[in-house]
């Protein structure tokens, strides 16, 4: 049976409704793929760019944690400057080029590995993964096959998860504590399975900032690749705050033209300067200020979507000049890549 296509997707099942405090600790999290590999600029970061990121973190007294450590820190309401560096896919360039730089600056990271490709021509082997783990790198689960699971059946995802966990346990002596969805694609059934297996959290590929009340099983990360990895862009993302959405509902007349409804507290946000984008282009929006300072926002594309994955992004400045960020990845499984 195909994964259910939900025309009404109630994300508040995970986000819930909660009381917002004046200060909530938050952590910017970044995702990298290849390091110093000019063949693939869309997923590569130049080594001088990556080292500039690390130097800035060091010079400005940031704690750099694994994802598991960061999720635990959020529970403590700590206000220590903190960042999380994650790496997807387990390419050799991480081991050869990035790991030495992390060691140089005394930082850790979380490396998400898809087990089927381990030992392939462009990928780390198990010995290199063990060596990275011994150097303090957290190893996360990125599936076995890196498949498009929204196009499969629930059993396929369950079996893939079991296969990857068995390989991790056999080769590393333990299964990972965190998971990264291939292509950032997930649904309710996948979330529920990952949570039921005892993982601490899971990450997707939409951009945003971690915070205590955020849903822990589809967490956002800022992508870092050559075009978007300039130091000023990295610093800007480090200083970004979460838009703490208390309710989110997604409806679609058809999959190609969704409508997203959000609710959040106005607090010190300059909502008249709200910006919304659909895959980088401006979107249609309507907004009203309801009782008790609740902002109700509707965003939608101005035309039918033609991509498999489309990122909706909302940013709002506050009275202190800080930007608050929320994004949502809309997936149309019927479109092949």
Regions found by a protein language model. Give the residues of each.
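Histidine- and/or cysteine-centered catalytic micro-motif in compact active-site loops
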Residues: 114, 144, 207-208, 265
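Acidic, His- and aromatic-enriched active-site or binding-groove loops in soluble protein domains
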Residues: 199-208
